[in-house]
Amino acid sequence: MGRDIYPNMQRLLAFARQSGMKIVYTLHTHREDGSDMGMFAEVWSPIANGACLVDGLPGIDVVPELTPQENELVIKKHRYSGFFGTDLDMILRSANINTVAVTGVTTENCCHSTARDAMFNGYRVAFLSDATGTFDYPDAGFGAIPASEVHRVTLGILAVSTAHVMDTEEFLRLSSTSRAGQCSAA
């Protein structure tokens, strides 16, 4: 899931670092005792049985290819959105950020929720179509859904409701001509 987006994310990180953009990583984690899982435990069994997204266990860390540098923020979140229950909005506002670029996984959950909340909070949103990814959905009573379809539909919804959906090349081109430091990669 998502490894094919690493090269684009690496290009984006290199550009953001060189341009002085604020880079913020968000990690979806839950407490070991499960006290913050809420409905996640009801709808997704890997969370319910503590097999994934548990703070301190392998699998929640940023992959080595995209490791944050010392000066880059890493925010742990307990819901899909990087804004919900975190200080992300305050951090961005204090840095006079007005645009958020969204990358990562999963397109339809964490990335989509973060993009929506960014827009709801008054930010311009760039959603990077080739730097976001997802996985195949099993049949939950509605038929299995391939990752490509989940991704395509989510991008279509975002494009007409929430964000400027673009690929890495377009983002780099547009960002090269705008003022550096006004955008945050999340």
Task: Label every model-predicted segment.
Residues 1-10:
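Short catalytic helix/loop segments, enriched in acidic residues and glycine
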Residues 10-19, 43-186:
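Active-site-adjacent betaalpha module
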Residues 21-29, 33, 128:
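Short beta-strand segments at enzyme active-site cores
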Residues 36-43:
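Short, flexible, mixed-charge acidic loops at enzyme active sites
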